[in-house]
């Protein structure tokens, strides 16, 4: 008999029911639980899968480059970035009628095309690419690299090349290599690219492999570097009248500290960015020599952590035992990595619009809105994953003996205090924020809008003023002729002060009562999500009710017969509930960003300022007003280029609604449904030609919840993606 799926679990493979298939899929990547898994094999499998992941990423980016080179209008866009719409790829669809063909033939194309809202055109243009051949070369190079990584992944699974567990647990060597190599040398290489290729391209000079070694990036060459006169590289920067991509108004500086934005492209100065990456390279290459490995010099991570014990004795054993706890737990390491990447992803969203790094990105409003939404949603999912693996760490890897009295154990001991404080903050934020919104709604409804409670965010405005924003008049507190004032003014970069006080960018936007309220609504969402996730992780091993549920595992569900009252210790349920809150929080955040910017881009900030102080304002003047094109996207009188987004908006709602079918039903319902279907199948002559051996059983509680949550999340994201792209591109083209 052929071996049945899944091969990695003898127990599941011999399960006579359809559970075999679903549980097999669910645990396919849970290598730890597979038959015959050793620690060594576990580390090697994960290591090899990293190469596969990187290969997929390179293949994907290669595909982006290839399709734009083949079907896009990159060269034409480069001639007039503000007026030519960038093409992602052509659309070939046999369902397109003549109106659709006409509606989607744009951007100077001869057939229907998709417009690119990913910012790749701006990125490639900024880093010095100018022709389709450049894009093809990049595509082929990345394709080659993807192949290389697939080979490397396979190679490291072969006995001769498979690293030992000791290699994976050599934390100091890994830190040194990642700091110096991954961050340091790659930043240095990027500085090199910016200085040798991108900056010359921005000044109208093409540097490729044929002239790379003969073209000096700076007229003085390396002489200033070796003589210590580094300031020479900052002299003669591009002027305010510089036309990007030409020599008009260009300077010769390569490493500057101008601050602010290039007046024409509205993006950060390339020479500032080169300087930034060089500084990071220096810092990280030095940092990568900190830890003790081969030569017996440098820090030992373990010694540092063991020494971190507060002298007063009031903080217990401090960081004792943490090195081994972290180093021996893949889930702990993954949790830390996910938390870091999540924060980084959210920071990317914030900085991509406030300080755009790519030329002409600031003037492409739809792309800005799309990039912000994209990075915030991804950040939310990744951060939830950090807590999930934190909970799995407590269940599978946490050893109370090895962590006696240290910060980890102490955190578990006073988890009641942590959870109750988070609970109190969430309740406070929720009642007060909603109370203000609802009060304002009532005042609007009763015709006395002047009785709204409108609170100016004075502390936030003060922080903005401290960064140099003059709008609020806080400088009245300064003594103008004081020497300290004069000295203080010089710490701001000249371009920064101009940038922060300009009304044409998104840097430190003017804020008022509407911002104050939505800020606290987002704070409510963040604290509630954190409360659910933190409680799920801290109670993962047990609570007062059930002291230790280690053997129940992570995906233990908290309802069903005989499991009454165990909901407070199901880490899976906590994660599941938190994702709903996380999605809500991210949506409030992107609603705020999008509406604030629509008002800014349209030159009418009053609409946001006046309508954002009450809930009806958000529903009517943001959601409804901006979805009107989508609700009327295609009708008996025809269609337009927004019709596809209108259809996606509808389809997203449908997927989202399907989620509730799985969320508001219990396991017995599915079993009944399946048995009814089987009964009908067996009594239908034609259907009896198809036979299966597995006995059909219903989804488990956790599975039904997962299916429901997945539909909810996918529908949610699809709906908002269609909304944000259609409502923005419908206004600004």
Curated annotation (Swiss-Prot):
Its EC number is 1.97.1.12. P700 is a chlorophyll a/chlorophyll a' dimer, A0 is one or more chlorophyll a, A1 is one or both phylloquinones and FX is a shared 4Fe-4S iron-sulfur center. Pfam families: PsaA_PsaB. GO terms for molecular function: 4 iron, 4 sulfur cluster binding; chlorophyll binding; electron transfer activity; magnesium ion binding; oxidoreductase activity. Chlorophyll a B3 binds at residues 661, 669. It is an enzyme of class 1 (oxidoreductase). [4Fe-4S] cluster binds at residues 558, 567. One of its GO terms (biological process) is photosynthesis. Its main location: plastid. Phylloquinone binds at residue 670. InterPro entries: PSI_PsaA/B, PSI_PsaA/B_CS, PSI_PsaA/B_sf, PSI_PsaB. The chain crosses the membrane at residues 46-69, 135-158, 175-199, 273-291, 330-353, 369-395, 417-439, 516-534, 574-595, 642-664, 706-726. It is a multi-pass membrane protein. Chlorophyll a B1 binds at residue 653. It comes from the Eukaryota. It catalyses: reduced [plastocyanin] + hnu + oxidized [2Fe-2S]-[ferredoxin] = oxidized [plastocyanin] + reduced [2Fe-2S]-[ferredoxin]. Keywords: 4Fe-4S, Chlorophyll, Chloroplast, Chromophore, Electron transport, Iron, Iron-sulfur, Magnesium, Membrane, Metal-binding, Oxidoreductase, Photosynthesis, Photosystem I, Plastid, Thylakoid, Transmembrane, Transmembrane helix, Transport. One of its GO terms (cellular component) is chloroplast thylakoid membrane. It is found in: Plastid, Chloroplast thylakoid membrane. PsaA and PsaB bind P700, the primary electron donor of photosystem I (PSI), as well as the electron acceptors A0, A1 and FX. PSI is a plastocyanin/cytochrome c6-ferredoxin oxidoreductase, converting photonic excitation into a charge separation, which transfers an electron from the donor P700 chlorophyll pair to the spectroscopically characterized acceptors A0, A1, FX, FA and FB in turn. Oxidized P700 is reduced on the lumenal side of the thylakoid membrane by plastocyanin or cytochrome c6. The PsaA/B heterodimer binds the P700 chlorophyll special pair and subsequent electron acceptors. PSI consists of a core antenna complex that captures photons, and an electron transfer chain that converts photonic excitation into a charge separation. The eukaryotic PSI reaction center is composed of at least 11 subunits. Belongs to the PsaA/PsaB family. PANTHER family: OUTER MEMBRANE PROTEIN, OMPA-RELATED (PTHR30128), PHOTOSYSTEM I P700 CHLOROPHYLL A APOPROTEIN A1-RELATED (PTHR30128:SF19). This is Photosystem I P700 chlorophyll a apoprotein A2. It comes from Ostreococcus tauri. The gene is psaB.
């Amino acid at each position: 008999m052929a071996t049945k799926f899944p091969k990695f679990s003898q127990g599941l493979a011999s399960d006579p029911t359809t559970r075999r298939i679903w549980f097999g899929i669910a645990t396919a990547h849970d290598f730890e639980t597979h038959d015959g898994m050793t620690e060594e094999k576990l580390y090697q499998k994960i290591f090899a899968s990293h190469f596969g992941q990187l290969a997929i990423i390179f293949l994907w980016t290669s595909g982006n480059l290839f399709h734009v080179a083949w079907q896009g209008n990159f060269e034409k866009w480069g001639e007039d970035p503000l007026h030519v719409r960038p093409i992602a790829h052509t659309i070939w669809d046999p369902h397109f009628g003549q109106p659709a063909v006409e509606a989607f033939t744009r951007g100077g194309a001869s057939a229907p095309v998709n417009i690119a809202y990913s910012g790749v055109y701006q990125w490639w243009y900024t880093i010095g690419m100018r022709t389709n051949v450049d894009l093809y070369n990049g595509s082929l190079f990345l394709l080659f690299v993807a192949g290389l990584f697939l080979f490397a992944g396979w190679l490291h699974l072969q006995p001769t090349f498979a690293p030992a567990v000791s290699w994976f647990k050599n934390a100091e060597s890994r830190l040194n290599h990642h700091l110096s190599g991954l961050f340091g040398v790659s930043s240095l290489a990027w500085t090199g690219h910016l200085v040798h290729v991108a900056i010359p391209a921005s000044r109208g000079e093409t540097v490729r492999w044929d002239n790379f070694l003969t073209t000096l990036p700076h007229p003085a060459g390396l002489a200033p570097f070796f003589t210590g006169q580094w300031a020479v590289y900052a002299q003669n920067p591009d002027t305010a009248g510089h036309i990007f991509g030409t020599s008009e108004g260009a300077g010769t500086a390569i490493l500057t500290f101008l601050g602010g934005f290039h007046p024409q492209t509205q993006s950060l100065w390339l020479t500032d960015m080169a300087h930034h990456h060089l500084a990071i390279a220096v810092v990280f290459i030095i940092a990568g020599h900190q830890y003790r490995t081969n030569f017996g010099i440098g820090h030992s991570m373990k010694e540092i952590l063991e020494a971190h014990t507060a002298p007063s004795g009031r903080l217990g054993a401090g960081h004792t035992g943490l090195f081994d706890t972290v180093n021996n737990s893949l889930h702990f390491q993954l949790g830390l990595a996910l938390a870091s990447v999540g924060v980084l992803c959210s920071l990317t969203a914030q900085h991509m619009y406030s300080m755009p790094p790519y030329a002409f990105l600031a003037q492409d409003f739809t792309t800005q809105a799309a990039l912000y939404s994209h990075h915030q949603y991804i950040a939310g999912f990744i951060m939830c994953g950090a807590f999930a693996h934190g909970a799995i760490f407590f269940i599978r890897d946490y050893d109370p003996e090895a962590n006696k009295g240290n910060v980890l154990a102490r955190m578990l001991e006073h988890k009641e205090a942590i959870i109750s404080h988070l609970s109190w903050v969430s309740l406070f934020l929720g009642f007060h924020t909603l109370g203000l919104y609802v009060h304002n709604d009532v005042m609007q409804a009763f015709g006395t809008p002047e009785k709204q409670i409108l609170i100016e965010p004075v502390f936030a405005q003060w922080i903005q003023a401290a960064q140099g924003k003059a709008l609020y008049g806080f400088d009245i507190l300064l003594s103008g002729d004081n020497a300290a004032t004069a000295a203080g003014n010089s710490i701001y970069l000249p371009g920064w002060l101009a940038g922060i006080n300009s009304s044409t960018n998104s840097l430190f936007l003017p804020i008022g009562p509407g911002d104050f309220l939505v800020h606290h609504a987002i704070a409510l969402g963040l604290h509630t999500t954190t409360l659910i996730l933190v409680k799920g992780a801290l109670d993962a091993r047990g609570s007062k009710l059930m002291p230790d549920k280690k053997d129940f595992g992570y995906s233990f569900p908290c309802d069903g017969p005989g499991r009454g009252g165990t909901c407070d210790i199901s880490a899976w349920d906590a994660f599941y509930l938190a994702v709903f809150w996380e999605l809500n929080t991210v949506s409030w955040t992107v609603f705020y960003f999008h509406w604030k910017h629509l008002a800014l881009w349209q030159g009418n900030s009053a609409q946001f300022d006046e309508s954002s102080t009450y809930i009806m304002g958000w529903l009517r003047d943001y959601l409804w007003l901006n979805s009107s094109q989508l609700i009327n996207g295609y009708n008996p009188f025809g269609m337009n280029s927004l019709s596809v987004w209108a259809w996606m908006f509808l389809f997203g709602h449908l997927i989202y609604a399907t989620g509730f079918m799985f969320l508001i039903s219990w396991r017995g319902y599915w079993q009944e449904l399946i048995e009814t279907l089987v009964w009908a199948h067996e009594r239908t002559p034609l259907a009896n030609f198809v036979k299966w051996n597995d006995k059909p059983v219903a989804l488990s509680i956790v599975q039904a919840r997962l299916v429901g949550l997945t539909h909810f999340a996918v529908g949610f994201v699809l709906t908002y993606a269609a909304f944000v792209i259609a409502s923005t591109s419908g206004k600004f083209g």
